[in-house]
Amino acid sequence: YEMFLDYSDNHPAACLNYDPSHFLLQQLDYLDFIRLYSERIKGVHVKDAEFRPTGRVGVYGGYQSWSGRAGRFRSLGDGQVDFTRVFTLLTEAGYNSWAVLEWECCVKSPEQGAAEGAPFIAKHIIETADVAFDDFAGGGTDQTQNRQILGLS
């Protein structure tokens, strides 16, 4: 990606649609990529995958059956992508755009994947806090109320 940015002179339109499943299948750190390039992420595909190498099949395992591949796409939550961390890092980076279900799975039916997909994404969307939990500490206190709560008055 850095070569692309170099060749485009870091053009502001040189942005991307982030898809953690492809990073996982390439054995790249999909979480670190968010940290490195969050300002370039303008869309997100919510898609899961798993990488299961064996003594016979790996990254360059040749053509295998859909379910026999070392790297394969899975329904959301059935693969190895840590979506809690993905959504947390995106939220912390200020991402506020689309999170689109992209589905392929070599095990489940499309109907089951679709039925599970929207609730899965909704469960991972993070509403950002408007205040810190300890913001109250900078405010004043009501001594009378505190004494009543403690049973001292």
Set out the residue ranges of the language-model regions.
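A short, acidic, flexible beta-alpha connecting loop/helix-capping segment that sits on the rim
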Residues: 101-109, 138
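A general structural detector for well-ordered alpha-helical segments in enzyme core domains, enriched
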Residues: 1-4, 33, 85-86, 116-121
